[in-house]
Amino acid sequence: MEGSATVHMAAPAEKIWDLIADIRNTGRFSPETFEAEWLDGATGPALGARFRGHVRRNEIGPVYWTVCKVTACERPREFGFAVMAGGRSVNNWHYRLAPAGDGTDVTESFRLTPSVLTTVYYWAFGGWLRKRRNIRDMTKTLQRIKDVVEAD
């Protein structure tokens, strides 16, 4: 399962990337992840850096922590991370920034790591509904980022 959303922002890619890649800002923008913090002494974005996010699933619960690992970190073009479980990636989130007209097109995407578990989840537990929810929430996240970068 995968999906994406794109929003145009009238701001330079560097400004947007700096806001996105500082995961401590996540709670300002994400409908579900209300806080995040770097782990293992990391103080900022770097390939392989780990962080954890505090998630309130579907904005109502359950509430849990996820450990994530930065998988793409190229200022000002892309930032990505994998949500880890038992040392394995289960979900991948990615931001791609591309110059466009008076600003930057920002695309946020997710892709569940293919496995028996994700296949069962998709077909038996309404995973397609989660895809719709993720796309809606990515659009909301990007709109909130847009509001901040265009207000400055």
Where are these regions (language model features)?
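Hydrophobic ligand-binding cavity/cleft-lining segments
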Residues: 1-43, 144
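Exposed loop/turn and edge beta-strand positions of beta-sandwich/beta-sheet ligand-binding modules
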Residues: 3, 64, 91
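Generic structural detector for well-ordered beta-strands
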Residues: 6-10, 37, 54, 69, ...
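Amphipathic alpha-helical protein-protein interaction surfaces
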Residues: 12, 22-25, 75, 102, ...
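Glycine-rich portal/gate segments that line the openings of hydrophobic small-molecule binding cavities
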Residues: 37-88, 100-105, 139-152
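Beta-strand/loop substructures that line and gate deep hydrophobic ligand-binding cavities in soluble
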Residues: 83-140, 145
